[in-house]
Amino acid sequence: MRLKRAGVPAEHRAARTKPEIALAEIDRVIASGVRFGCVLADSGYGSSGPFRQALSERGLLWAVGLSQRQNVYPADIALIFPIAKTGKPRKYHIPDQSPVSAEALLAEGKWQRVSWRRGTKGRLTCLFTARRVRVADGHKHRMLNNRMQCMPGDEVWLVGERRSTGEQKYYVSNLPADATIKTLAATIKARWVCEQAHQQLKEELGLDHFEGRSWTGLHRHALMTMIAYAFLQSRRLKAAGRKKKNRRTATTTKHAGHQASDPRPLRTTSTPTMSSL
């Protein structure tokens, strides 16, 4: 009754999980012709095996957060057919190794400092390690010790990030097996832009300030904040473009003045690209 009073359409009244809502939105934007390179999400979505599998079934690349407690198998895991000592012969294969948590598997990994882009205060760097694994997100099967255990899924990248604060984050991605650690890090950290946008929508433009009780009112409020954000973003990009143009003009003028007074060639230097949301 409350949903009806709020004007919620009948097709949106059924309860849905966050991954289900996300998949519906992904299908919607794909159908509208939007192109994107990779689906990024935090562990609230990434820890869902059905969500990751649904992305793969759609032929999408993804890099998502993962709980440190998620069980994984090494990529070289083999499925064996155990011989039952008593009783009926076993019908299904089982892994020849037990799964371990993502945290435990990467604990002894080779961590290396990776720089993925330039920020306002210099290069952004962090410690990363990566290993090919198979996440324990397949169907559940009863093992020899009578314990239920998830079977290994598809082979993917398991990535660990160790921040300067000591905090560690874990991610999983279906990027190609020949992807470099820098590519993995840059792809994972690209989600920072989305997080910044969401934070600014809430803190600067009041996305979370709506106090109404109607479906239409909520959507109008969200639409207006997004229009305002799009306008501000266009102004930022124009300002960034002008600054880059001014730097190029100043560099060209400096080169011309140098060459007029000194016949020796001036060594050119690359101008870093300004990052913007």
What are these regions (language model features)?
Residues 1-15, 65-68, 72-193, 267, ...:
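An anionic, glycine-rich sequence signature occurring as long contiguous blocks
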Residues 1-68:
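Polybasic low-complexity intrinsically disordered regions
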Residues 39-45, 62, 171, 192-201, ...:
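Short, conserved catalytic/metal-binding motifs centered on acidic residues
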Residues 50, 96, 173, 180-188, ...:
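Short, solvent-exposed helix-loop connector elements
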Residues 177, 190, 194, 199, ...:
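Short, well-ordered loop/turn and helix-capping segments at boundaries between secondary-structure elements
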Residues 222-235, 274:
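Short, hydrophobic/amphipathic alpha-helical patches that form generic packing surfaces
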Residues 232-267:
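Conserved nucleotidyltransferase catalytic core and NTase-mimicking acidic/glycine-rich helix/loop elements
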